[in-house]
């Protein structure tokens, strides 16, 4: 592309960074970086009543954690600020006045009750609710009368009649809207605060945003924004609307969906890796060429192609997320995974709050046992239950394993060998098991399966010598003694 690419992610601090917004930020970031452009983070904070105290800081913190480095924002002003809408009144106000003077906007004094009554009547008649234009041509005398009554006006944009607004969506193709289906809409609320569709169009123009990539739910906002560009004689940016994210039942992903965690913070807390979430979310509604699914951030930037954004809804597959994160977990060094897992082990009272070096060394060995199968760091707690709790009650299959005629001899032999081991380490335990095999003649499954069931209560698990080492001599001997 010949022009400089400038895109924006514009969150509201009324909430925290969730999967949908993270995807919006991510696709904008990849698009900008692919074309050596600018990724701008703008804060849309005009809804002061709903803004959360830590809403803004949480957005930035989680974007940074995901690896999205912005080029411009409240902390990096490159001459296009302010980057908070609440600080841009000096930009909005003259433009609003201009629209009023050019009769492209007007003051509307209708009350909320009057507007609601109109809306209900339209619905009752089977009509699409829209403002009927009752105050579109008030006389000066009527305006003064409403002012005298203490009514505060909103300001509405005067929608042109019989006009078609068309744009070529980079995802959906050509989309058109008829202006006659859109009532005169509010650009300034009664409290004097500009509405979303006015402010966002002004901000995108003054910040020289070249491309607007956002969720499917913003398609209906586009004609209103195009009206603002037209009213001021500005060139509109290109638009692209990403497909919905749906759950495994093909229903729109909702914050009320109890099956899927919605917020990036929740995945951080569970011990997911940021690069894994980056990878997984990028594949929600976009696909690379070929079959490969694991890419680094740098690789994604290189191969990102907006033409491969999908029109079809993207399914949030929890098993796929677990698989992707597991691929990254396997490549990490044990120390990194241990540090991620440590808070979970402490919270479950499995490791002391202030672990000694001996505790930490034991924890590293525990992680090494399960690292290849862990989907996230916090999963170490349910995976490693056998190390912290009493032997579980054996199931039918496990009981059958221990009923083999060779088992009593095997257990007695094993107990004696383990008891006499001076160095209770995996390498020595492995040698000792080979000695038991040689001395008893028991081998294969008939050797290993009874030992595993006897010391862990399970038929499957990590490497047996390593498992025995991590369980510790006292616990293993106690379990064998109870069995014998």
From Swiss-Prot:
It is an enzyme of class 6 (ligase). ATP binds at residue 255. It is found in: Cytoplasm. One of its GO terms (cellular component) is cytosol. GO terms for molecular function: ATP binding; glutamate-tRNA ligase activity; tRNA binding; zinc ion binding. Gene3D superfamilies: 1.10.10.350, HUPs (3.40.50.620). Transmembrane segments: none annotated. A motif ('KMSKS' region) lies at residues 252-256. The keyword Cytoplasm applies. Catalyzes the attachment of glutamate to tRNA(Glu) in a two-step reaction: glutamate is first activated by ATP to form Glu-AMP and then transferred to the acceptor end of tRNA(Glu). Belongs to the class-I aminoacyl-tRNA synthetase family. Glutamate--tRNA ligase type 1 subfamily. This is Glutamate--tRNA ligase. It comes from Staphylococcus epidermidis (strain ATCC 35984 / DSM 28319 / BCRC 17069 / CCUG 31568 / BM 3577 / RP62A).
